[in-house]
C-alpha cells in the first residue's frame, strides 16, 4: 500500500518524582515532509501538555484519566481524491493504543469536513459502520451521502484521551512513559 503522507505522533511522558509524587506528562506531535505531488498532512500544534500530576492524590488500583486534548488535523491534496486514513501505533488491547507498559490512549476524529462541508467517517471495508474512533488496525474513509467522497481538503479535530494506571503513577524515581505512532493516508479501494 502506497503511503501518500505520514504524520508522526509521539505521546511521551516524563515523570519527576520527589517527596511529593508528581509527573509532568507531555504529548509531542509533528509532521514529516512529503513531496509536492502528494497530499499534505498537518496538525495545529506540535505539543500537547498534560500538566503536572500528583501521584499521592491519584495512585491506586484504578486507571487515572489524564484528560481530553484536542488538535486540528488538516489534509490538503493537489487533486480531488478519496481520503482514507489510519493511525499506526502499538495496540494496547485491540481497541486502544499503548502508552508505555501501563497506559493507553484513544483517538477520535470529530467534526470532519471535506472541502468545507460536513461528512461522515466509516470503516473502509464496511461503509454501513460509521465510526469516528481510530482503533488499532482500522482504516476510516470519508463519506458523503453514504459513499466514499472525493475532495481536496479534509479537516477534523483529533481528540486524544489518555489514561495511566494508578500503579504507574505511584513510583519514586524518574519515569519515562512513551507511546505513539503515525497517521497514514491510504488508498480507499
Question: PLM ranges: what are they?
Answer:
Residues 31-33:
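N-terminal signal peptide c-region/cleavage motif recognized by signal peptidases
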Residues 2-6, 11, 35-189:
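Mature extracellular/passenger domains of Gram-negative fimbrial/pilin and adhesin proteins
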Residues 13-15, 20:
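Residue-identity detector for glycine
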Residues 20-29:
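Bacterial N-terminal signal peptides
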Amino acid at each position: 500500500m502506497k503511503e501518500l503522507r505520514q504524520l508522526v505522533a509521539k505521546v511521551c511522558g516524563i515523570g519527576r518524582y520527589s517527596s511529593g509524587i508528581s509527573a509532568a506528562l507531555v504529548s509531542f506531535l509533528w509532521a514529516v515532509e512529503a513531496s509536492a505531488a502528494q497530499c499534505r498532512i498537518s496538525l495545529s500544534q506540535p505539543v500537547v501538555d498534560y500538566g503536572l500530576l500528583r501521584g499521592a492524590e491519584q495512585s491506586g488500583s484504578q486507571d487515572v484519566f489524564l484528560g481530553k486534548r484536542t488538535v486540528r488535523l488538516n489534509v490538503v491534496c493537489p487533486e480531488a481524491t478519496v481520503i482514507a486514513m489510519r493511525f499506526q501505533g502499538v495496540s494496547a488491547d485491540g481497541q486502544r493504543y499503548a502508552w508505555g507498559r501501563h497506559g493507553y490512549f484513544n483517538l477520535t476524529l470529530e467534526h470532519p469536513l471535506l472541502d468545507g462541508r460536513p461528512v461522515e467517517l466509516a470503516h473502509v471495508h464496511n461503509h454501513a459502520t460509521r465510526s469516528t474512533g481510530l482503533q488499532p488496525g482500522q482504516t476510516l474513509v470519508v463519506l458523503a451521502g453514504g459513499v466514499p467522497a472525493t475532495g481536496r481538503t479534509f479537516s477534523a479535530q483529533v481528540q486524544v484521551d489518555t489514561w495511566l494506571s494508578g500503579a504507574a503513577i505511584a513510583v519514586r524515581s524518574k519515569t519515562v512513559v512513551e507511546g505513539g505512532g503515525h497517521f497514514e493516508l491510504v488508498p480507499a479501494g
